[in-house]
Amino acid sequence: MNIKKNWISSAHRGFVEGALKENSLAAFYNAHINGADMIETDARFSSDGILIANHNPTAEGLNDKGEEVTCVVAETPAETLCSLILSEDDVWGVQRIPTLEQVLNLAYHTGLQVNIDLKNGYEAAEPVAKMVLKCGMIGRVVYALNGSGMKGIETIMAIDPDARFIDKGTGFAQSVQTFAERGKRCFCYTDDVSEENVNAIRDYGCLLALISLNENNYESAIRQKPDMCEFLHTSDFRAIEENYLKKVKLY
């Protein structure tokens, strides 16, 4: 019996082991070599308008003197943010906060797809899509709309006609009911794997993305036949999926 997975395996902020830090180029590359189909990252504007890959409104790291520094991303220029050291001793050397462009360039050369969380919402839709175009990643990006709905979809598709989209649960599903291609392009993400919730998303005609997965909740999630499985950055998704597929072969 030939068993294979039919879902997208996504590593939330990469895959962290040892001294690696989330949302670093090393964490994203580690996700790639462990077999991820996709990585998830975040896009925020620095004070000078550069898209930075950082989850929180603040960025934390070490300066070149080894001192701990916390910066408000929106109030700090990119040069300062990208000089902050995330880790000094991981297997790929010193890691600093990356720009979105650096993340997309890595994805281009590794074949990864990317889920980009637009932390600035609609304001970031056009700039992020233009960066995706610049980096040769058209058709390989899922845009997390952060509530920008059909307005965001239309703006992005004018630049990236093969774009896919993701947002939270049934609220997003309801907001895209006029979008004829939602069944191919729109993922609803949720950590609620109940039949009621999953069926509601399916009934709206959207794709299902289950998030925050680890070894404890994966099997209950995969029973719902998701289109995307997004794993926590500390989850060994490769081992989890291999163990599951071995069990399937025994049925």
Residue ranges of model-derived segments:
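Phosphate-group recognition and catalysis centered on beta-loop-alpha active-site segments
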Residues: M1-Y251
